[in-house]
């Protein structure tokens, strides 16, 4: 690997982005694609459109944890340009249909970094990279080929500028996927002298993934050679072939500076549907117009929030964060409405947009609540997608990827996500069916729930990560209870509300921590609240310091466990000042530490807002401003942990606007400390203007609040007031204050 300092690596990319001359009303100019490409951010780098099925970008040789998106700023290798990528996940997959332009004969393999001839890969220089929303460019040093990429929702458009060669080629790599992914069956066929098609079936995180494609070239190719990878591989005869791992070499003669365009459409259903997608979205070859359309699509979404600030770095961080919240969920259907369901069946011409990449354990906390504000037009489709997943697999999604349930992470995170849509009054789906899905998912006797129903909690001697699973189930039960109450189902409300209090079993009044409890009612010993052993203790990517606060649905009940507000507050204060040392084989996800508060991982994200809920909002303001200004940066390592499909950035977006939804569903956004002087947020019924008067780094404390010109004496703003639009005013000052009554 060619390692340099992060600042040097990113300089070329930043200059290239800034060298563009966008319109004065363009907000894409403030998106810095480098942010999150270093450290443990794991963000996607490449060309796409908002929520698109295609994420077209470079894929590097390494397959270790910091390369789950296929790209890391410390690396300068590329094996090709893949059409699917994940954004900020802690597990790798995808990288489907990887395309690599080459000159001369190559080895058909991923290759190793110690031997440039071991595969097709090439070095590139970050100084030659250009990246902005919907566009990516680089130069392949090994081949002297300039690469530019752009995309529509379902089509990737490649622009390759070749040197003179009688042996130029574009290679389709169907063998190499991402990290845990491996092909199970691949197919390539020649359709005519401009077109090839095929598919890639694979298994990995998504156990049965199927991506079909068709690819057209802007000039006739002179040859198609199909190679089989692996030890027994080699050239295969004919214009079509099916095997576990294939490469298709499409050959050309090129003159110096000649440009060849390649457009690749994908489908989860069939080659025929991939062709339909191409015909509908990209029938022509105008690269500049396609890139401009992608820029317009991104700008239209970014325009939903316009901020006023004199801090240029904060502006870049904000719009990059907003961009990151719209990479996924991604569309998982064709232009004719067809998609592949969780049961493996093809559903035809459905009347909604089907989505995938639901990282719900992460996103129910902030990314989904942000979506309900900024993307009301998408909420019926998101809800219908979840309901169809429920019908096909018998439960709401947990971590859904490419039509597959991965069951990744703990709890029932699809429940608060769907409940939030119901409680916020969204329509376009059957509310009774939604409640059925919520209830049945909450009653399914799997993943520790059978033990929970038997014992009233999940015993730590019978199930791994018992505390984490149970506490996530508890907050999901609360969400079910709120929907039951909304629909007049009193008995269900009482049942699920009581079950949502199961967290109390784990609270040890002696140590004042949540601890593992065995089937005989005994706390696990020995006990160390700083200790975390990844995948082998009572917590999930955390420890007792972090999980003790995972009761966002019943803060009053948690205060009661402590014996009152004074003891609760004292312990909460301690969280931020104790040692940040982690003991045991802790997960690297436990990052962004302030004391034992871990902003780099999701279970901590609501914790700073607990102060507002108990009448000490100045402490929320202190911590929110500290996190906004020290744990987010406009550098490659500008995120304190995994992006996690938009969650890390959604926290920034909401918190910088001045509020955050603490409870897992329902729409009370508690106040913190607005970062910007003014923000205009396009909402369901108009525009919400958020103004912070007398705002500065010193004047970070809310003194008073007005809503539509009238004094507002609540610690939160309700979703309905946000969605209605209007004017929310904060009067800021340098002294702590309380403007509300509890």
Regions found by a protein language model. Give the residues of each.
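Bacterial N-terminal signal peptides that target proteins for export
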Residues: 1-8
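ATP-dependent phospho-/nucleotidyl transfer catalytic cores
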Residues: 476
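C-terminal motif of bacterial Sec signal peptides marking the signal peptidase cleavage site
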Residues: 16-17
């Amino acid at each position: 690997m060619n390692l340099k300092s992060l600042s040097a690596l990113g300089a070329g990319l930043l200059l290239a982005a800034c060298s563009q001359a966008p319109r004065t009303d363009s907000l894409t100019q403030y998106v810095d694609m480098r942010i999150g490409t270093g450290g443990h951010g794991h963000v996607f780098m490449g060309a796409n459109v908002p929520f698109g099925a295609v994420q077209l970008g470079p894929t590097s040789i390494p397959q270790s944890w910091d390369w789950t998106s296929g790209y890391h700023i410390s690396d300068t290798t590329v094996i090709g340009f893949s059409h699917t990528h994940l954004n900020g996940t802690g597990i790798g997959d995808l990288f489907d249909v990887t395309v690599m332009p080459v000159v001369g004969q190559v080895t058909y393999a991923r290759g190793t970094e110690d031997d440039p001839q071991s595969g097709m890969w090439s070095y590139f220089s970050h100084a030659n990279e250009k990246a902005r929303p919907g566009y990516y460019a680089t130069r392949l040093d090994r081949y002297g080929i300039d690469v530019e990429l752009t995309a529509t929702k379902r089509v990737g458009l490649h622009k390759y500028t070749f040197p003179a060669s009688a042996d130029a080629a574009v290679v389709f790599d169907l063998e190499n996927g991402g990290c845990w992914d491996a092909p199970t069956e691949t197919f390539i066929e020649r359709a005519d002298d401009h077109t090839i098609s095929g598919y890639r079936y694979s298994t990995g995180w998504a156990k049965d993934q199927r991506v079909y494609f068709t690819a057209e070239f802007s000039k006739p190719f002179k040859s198609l050679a199909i190679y089989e990878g692996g030890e027994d591989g080699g050239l295969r005869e004919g214009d079509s072939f099916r095997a576990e791992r294939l490469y298709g070499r499409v050959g050309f003669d090129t003159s110096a500076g000649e440009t060849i365009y390649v457009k690749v459409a994908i489908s989860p259903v069939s080659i025929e549907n991939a062709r339909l997608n191409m015909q509908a979205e990209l029938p022509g070859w105008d690269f500049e117009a396609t890139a401009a359309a992608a820029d317009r699509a991104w700008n239209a979404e970014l325009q939903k929030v316009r901020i006023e600030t004199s801090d240029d770095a904060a502006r870049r961080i904000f719009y990059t964060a907003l961009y990151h919240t719209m990479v996924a969920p991604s569309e998982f259907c064709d232009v004719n409405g067809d998609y592949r369901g969780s049961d493996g069946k093809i559903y035809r011409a459905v009347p909604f947009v089907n989505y995938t990449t639901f990282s719900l354990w992460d996103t129910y906390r902030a990314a989904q609540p942000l979506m309900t504000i900024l993307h009301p037009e998408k909420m019926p489709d998101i809800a219908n997608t979840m309901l169809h997943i429920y019908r096909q697999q018998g439960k709401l999604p947990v971590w859904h990827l490419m039509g597959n349930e991965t069951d990744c992470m703990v709890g029932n995170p699809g429940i608060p996500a769907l409940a939030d849509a119901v409680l916020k009054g969204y329509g376009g789906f059957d509310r009774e069916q939604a409640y059925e899905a919520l209830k049945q998912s909450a009653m399914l006797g799997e993943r520790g729930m059978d033990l929970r129903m038997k014992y009233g909690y999940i015993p730590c001697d019978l199930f791994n990560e018992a505390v984490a699973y149970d506490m996530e189930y508890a907050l999901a039960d609360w969400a079910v209870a709120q929907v039951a109450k909304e629909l007049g189902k009193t008995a269900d409300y009482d049942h699920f509300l009581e079950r949502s209090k199961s967290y109390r079993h784990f609270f040890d009044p002696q140590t004042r921590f949540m601890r593992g409890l065995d089937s005989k009612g005994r706390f696990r010993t020995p006990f160390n609240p700083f200790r975390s052993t990844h995948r082998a203790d009572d917590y999930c990517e955390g420890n007792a310091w972090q999980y003790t606060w995972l009761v966002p649905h019943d803060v009053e009940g948690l205060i009661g466990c402590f014996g009152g507000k004074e003891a609760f507050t004292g312990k909460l204060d301690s969280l931020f000042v104790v040692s940040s040392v982690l003991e045991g084989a802790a997960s690297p996800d436990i990052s962004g530490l302030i004391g034992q508060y871990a902003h780099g991982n999701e279970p901590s994200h609501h914790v700073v807002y607990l102060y507002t809920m108990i009448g000490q909002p100045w402490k929320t303001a202190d911590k929110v401003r500290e996190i906004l200004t020290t744990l987010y940066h406009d550098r490659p390592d500008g995120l304190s942990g995994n992006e996690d499909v938009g969650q890390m950035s959604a926290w920034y977006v909401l918190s910088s606007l001045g509020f955050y939804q603490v409870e897992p569903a329902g729409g009370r956004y508690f106040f913190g400390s607005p970062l910007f002087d003014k923000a205009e947020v396009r909402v369901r019924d108009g525009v919400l203007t958020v103004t912070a008067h007398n705002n500065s780094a010193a004047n970070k404390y809310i003194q008073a609040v007005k809503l539509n010109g009238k004094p507002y004496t609540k610690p939160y703003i309700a979703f309905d007031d946000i969605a209605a639009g209007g004017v929310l005013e904060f009067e800021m000052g340098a002294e702590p204050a309380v403007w509300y009554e509890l």
